[in-house]
């Protein structure tokens, strides 16, 4: 199953490799309108994460999780309200409970327990060169994370 954020206040799913798309019905459960980042949990395809915000670039942002492929949603507990829409979400295949989320304005959040609790990196984009893309070996400078194919390591 594929998931994609294609419009304001909705994400879509496809069961035929993208030939057709159906709305997941996020709009009836999530109050912040602009859906942006979508991520399926690496070890459990039932669990979907959604990053969104009030608009494409500004306002309040939020993170949500669905345990049932988008039928129901919960807002995740961030340590502070993001300074903009959550655009990027990433996980690590070796540790699917490790997630990164970044706002359009540079804040980076991390969880090691699949989203039950989050911390905010002290440094933001501009100081962190690579934050939410895992494709083999990556590293962040001046704080952030470093990983290869093993479980991720955080540096502050």
Show where each model-derived region lies.
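Extracellular glycan-interacting surfaces
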Residues: 1-156
């Amino acid at each position: 199953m594929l998931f994609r954020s294609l419009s304001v206040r909705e994400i879509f799913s496809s069961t035929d490799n993208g030939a057709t798309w159906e709305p997941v019905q996020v709009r009836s459960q999530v109050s912040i309108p602009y859906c942006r980042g979508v991520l399926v949990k690496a070890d459990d395809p039932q669990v979907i994460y959604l990053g969104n915000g009030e608009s494409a670039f500004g306002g309040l942002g939020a993170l949500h999780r669905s345990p049932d492929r988008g039928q129901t949603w919960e807002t995740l507990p961030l340590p502070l309200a993001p300074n903009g829409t959550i655009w990027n979400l990433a996980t690590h295949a070796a540790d699917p409970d490790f997630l990164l989320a970044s706002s359009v304005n540079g804040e980076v959040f991390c969880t090691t327990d699949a989203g039950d609790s989050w911390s905010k990196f002290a440094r933001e984009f501009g100081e962190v060169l690579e934050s939410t893309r895992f494709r083999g070996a990556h590293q962040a400078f001046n704080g952030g994370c470093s990983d290869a194919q093993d479980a991720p390591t955080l540096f502050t």
